[in-house]
Amino acid sequence: MKLLHIDSSILGDHSVSRQLTAAIIARLQEVTPDLDVSHRDLAANPLSHLSGALLAASAPGAPAPDPSTQAALGESAAILAEFLAADIVVVGAPMYNFAISSQLKAWIDRLVIAGKTFRYADGAVEGLAGGRRLIIASSRGGVFEAGAAAAALDYQETYLRAIFGFIGIADVEIIRAEGLAFGEDARALAIKQAGDAILRLEAA
């Protein structure tokens, strides 16, 4: 069974989402024998954002692109293939300014491809990337869960549920540590609660 481990935090060793993804991987390795893990660090090795040249070169029947665009096409194809080959995907997704990091968005933009991970049929959208398990390690300084005063400002988890649901992954598991900026006690409690949730993860 293949697992794709994605980190996107820019905080390195100070990152809570990285701490959570590492713990999730350790837990899944414990309950799933022979797990084949691949790791992609989107902060250490960021992807370029989509460009007009890349989109034009991706169109059916497009003329041969210049060498740099051809390299970007190859990288995008490899990103998508890596995702589609995974049975389990673990994504570290810190909240930045109420949303996800631009590094993570650039990766997602390589996945949401018409004819590959979704299609339009009979006037509706059909996701084509179902059948894989998705676990998101969410970290945020404030409190944005349902019912919280700031819940309407959550464009992080809500976006991730929506975009992965769009491509067919409706059951998204979220391990959350929030309120991290509310003092050391609140931070420690949030991390402990997330750790407890990780220990309850079962094999796929």
UniProtKB/Swiss-Prot annotation:
FMN binds at residues 9, 15-17, 95-98, 139-142. Its cofactor is FMN. Binds 1 FMN per subunit. It is an enzyme of class 1 (oxidoreductase). Its EC number is 1.6.5.-, 1.7.1.17. Homodimer. Quinone reductase that provides resistance to thiol-specific stress caused by electrophilic quinones. Also exhibits azoreductase activity. Catalyzes the reductive cleavage of the azo bond in aromatic azo compounds to the corresponding amines. This is FMN-dependent NADH:quinone oxidoreductase. The gene is azoR.
